[in-house]
Amino acid sequence: MNIFSFYIINNDAPEPWQICYQDSATKIMSGIDKLTGEIFYYETLLLIIVGWVLISAIIKYTKTELSYKYFNHGTLIEILWTCSPAFILIAISFPSFKLLYLMDSIIDSQITIKVLGHQWYWSYEYSDYLDNSGDSISFDSIMIPTDDLEPGQFRLLEVDNRIVLPIHTHIRFICTSSDVIHSFAVPSLGLKIDALPGRLNGISTYVEREGTFYGQCSELCGVYHFGMPIVIEAVRIEKYLEWLNIHLDNTPSS
């Protein structure tokens, strides 16, 4: 590894014993990561303060004959320990309201992708594009078995057909299910939406950098729930157009 390198290696896939988020590729996920870090900091500070008060009180009042050790009611202290957590929760909730609003907002999209959950694989349809026969681009995405993986690929996360998206483009996912409840989730993009049978749910994203992003079904959907990985490959618009041409079969015949 070159310590003088100006390149940043992003973590877009889960790792063993990982306890933090994957690196974000959207502003929404960056906001979620930042908010989580701030809340964790203040929670740690509160834990230290409250723990110190409790331990100090235990040590002090078990070694003294003061009458306060038998004190079992106090209006002021009860108001304080009731109102203080309420104010803290309110202060924490306000920054999250903006993120919740942005996550639920459906922006005018340039590309719409339909997502259909099955037991146990995903189907995708690019309904904005039609091939020479008038059909839209659609394909199934099935997990690659462990025995068929190539060196460097992730177990239980690789699929035979990936979603390919252009960066710096507003994209909308419309999700539903053909059988049971599934959940379409890609942590690096801040995407998580339920796929419900008989109902359409929508979510928008705007990918800011190239990369390969991994996700999974996040709703227990049966015995092979683990076998529903999601792989999204974000590329430059030029590569995306090349991918479209291949799938639309627009190459002139010789």
Curated annotation (Swiss-Prot):
Cu cation A2 binds at residues 217, 219, 221, 225. InterPro entries: CcO_II, CcO_II-like_C, CcO_II_C, Copper_CuA, Cupredoxin, Cyt_c_oxidase_su2, Cyt_c_oxidase_su2_TM_dom, Cyt_c_oxidase_su2_TM_sf. It catalyses: 4 Fe(II)-[cytochrome c] + O2 + 8 H(+)(in) = 4 Fe(III)-[cytochrome c] + 2 H2O + 4 H(+)(out). Its main location: mitochondrion. It comes from the Eukaryota. Residues 12-38, 95-248 are mitochondrial intermembrane. Residues 60-73 are mitochondrial matrix. Keywords: Copper, Electron transport, Magnesium, Membrane, Metal-binding, Mitochondrion, Mitochondrion inner membrane, Respiratory chain, Translocase, Transmembrane, Transmembrane helix, Transport. Its cofactor is Cu cation. Gene3D superfamilies: 1.10.287.90, Cupredoxins - blue copper proteins. It is found in: Mitochondrion inner membrane. One of its GO terms (cellular component) is mitochondrial inner membrane. This is Cytochrome c oxidase subunit 2. It comes from Zancudomyces culisetae (Gut fungus). The gene is cox2.
